[in-house]
């Protein structure tokens, strides 16, 4: 008897509140590493309504005066507020009616230096009997990795299919050709497996934020034709495949205006979509000394 089951994985667009937080944290990280590649960064972001709160620990060696031991403020390296606003602008929260808007959000900065207790275990040191210095890890952790032969990306099919939908939706929105699309979006794909082989897509869910003046039928027909049937394998789409487009019927209020967002809340989306194990650590806002990120990438 065949072993049959259905497995579902989701993806979220860059305008989803949690992904907004992830991108802001990673943008701060990128700015730190661009200024000093030895920076130690653990940046968390919270977004809600028209507010951005960043906090965490950042140490940039180039800002430290070795003679006095004093550290210059992070704004000596780069403009933190500009980095945040540019990240939000990149996502697309720039419409006149956006409550969460790149130019008008309030920013609260609670970044401090990395704990000296942690730093002493992370900073590279030349160990006895070693020719080169070795860098320590900032913490312990559980990380898992594997490859699957279901897709070209060597990842499980459900999560890759969900990502493809999200990427195509973002591509169309940023092209400016479809004026009613807005940044917040989610997708989910359910795949039927028979004896370990993906045989059909059972259903596809896409929820996308939109302007108030577009009809649900317009959204539905456009996404099925120009997103779903464009990026998903035709051989897996059958007459029985169910398409659920904005199933609540309306998605005008979205992004941080509709829901709060926090760095690190989409760890399953960022990894294997629920296949295999996950140690619980998030990626965004962390420099390579944080094994949650670096070890997972190498896995």
Which residues are covered by each model-predicted region?
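Conserved mixed alpha/beta catalytic, RNA-binding, or beta-rich assembly cores of soluble enzyme
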Residues: 60, 228, 262-299
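N-terminal, positively charged regions that mediate nucleic acid binding
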Residues: 1-42
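Glycine-rich, mobile lid/loop segments that gate access to catalytic sites or pores
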Residues: 8-11, 82, 87-253
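Short, charge-patterned binding micro-sites
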Residues: 43-64
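A generic structural motif
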Residues: 13, 58-74, 148-153, 209-214, ...
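Short glycine/threonine-rich loop-to-helix capping motif typified by GTGT followed
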Residues: 63, 248-267
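Short connector loops/turns at beta-strand edges and beta->alpha or beta->beta junctions
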Residues: 2, 48-50, 59, 148-149, ...
